[in-house]
């Protein structure tokens, strides 16, 4: 008897046919960190040909339990990003002094811990509300170059076997300019919600449950000042694949490429 694929499952139950052997598959297993990132060097780098910024200092993901992204309205993410998980966290990313994050720097923090996400179905079980458990952790800063135009935060986490669902990622970098560059816009795409600041001034906010789309939101006109400019951002996600892409564009929508990028 030949069974149609659509009837196969029913036939197994009704006729008592042997179940087909299946190997569990997980989207985040056997991830090669080096496929997505390389260590940042001391030398300045330029953005890619399309202006995307690939060099960043990334902080290990901070546990922020959420089983749904529908809560990511402006007020929610503003409050989430204002929280300091260690003393002087915000100030350290605002000024290029001795407290500015450094590659390999380890920070002791207190986070909203959560039990490991149940992945027996190959993806998070959204209906399970996380139990929040205050937890002392050590977070580390990493100076990386992304091998793609978008920074794949999910792979950054899985490549280190760190929490990848219900998290906040912080990123900061330094934009170097030989002269003032006026009337540019910061164009961002992120999965899921995010906020971005240039020289400690809010530039753009992306709220809601969203997928990463190139140039999804753009800031008002900005000026990149001669010298060093600090660009930082925070991305929050519940379930799903976290990533972002960032570049500056001019008034014609063309990428700004006459800049260099460092982590200090």
Listing of model-derived features with the role each one plays in the protein:
Residues 177, 186-190, 235-237:
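Non-cytosolic beta-sheet module surface loops
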Residues 198-246:
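Beta-strand-rich ligand-recognition modules
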């Amino acid at each position: 008897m030949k069974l149609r694929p659509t009837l196969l499952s029913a036939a197994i139950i009704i006729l008592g046919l042997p179940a087909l052997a299946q190997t569990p598959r997980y989207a985040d297993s056997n991830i090669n960190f080096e496929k997505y990132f390389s260590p940042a060097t001391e030398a300045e780098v330029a953005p890619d040909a399309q202006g995307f910024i690939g060099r960043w200092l990334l902080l290990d993901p901070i546990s922020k339990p959420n089983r749904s992204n529908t809560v990511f309205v402006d007020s929610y993410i503003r409050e989430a990003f204002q929280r300091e998980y260690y003393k002087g966290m915000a100030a350290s990313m605002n000024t290029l002094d001795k407290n500015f994050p450094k590659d390999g720097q380890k920070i002791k923090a207190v986070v909203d811990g959560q039990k490991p996400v149940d992945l027996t179905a190959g993806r998070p079980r959204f209906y399970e509300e996380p139990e929040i458990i205050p937890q002392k952790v050590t977070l580390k800063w990493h100076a990386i170059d992304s091998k793609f135009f978008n920074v794949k935060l999910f792979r950054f986490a899985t490549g280190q076997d760190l929490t990848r669902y219900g998290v906040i990622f912080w990123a900061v970098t330094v934009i170097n300019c030989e002269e003032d560059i006026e009337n540019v816009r910061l164009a961002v795409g992120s999965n899921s919600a995010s906020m971005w600041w240039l020289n400690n001034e809010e530039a753009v906010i992306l709220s809601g449950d969203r997928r990463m789309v190139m140039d999804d939101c753009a800031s008002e006109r900005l000026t990149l000042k001669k010298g060093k400019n600090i660009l930082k951002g925070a991305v929050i996600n519940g379930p799903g694949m976290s990533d972002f892409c960032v570049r500056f564009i001019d008034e014609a929508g063309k990428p700004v490429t006459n800049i260099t990028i460092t982590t200090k």
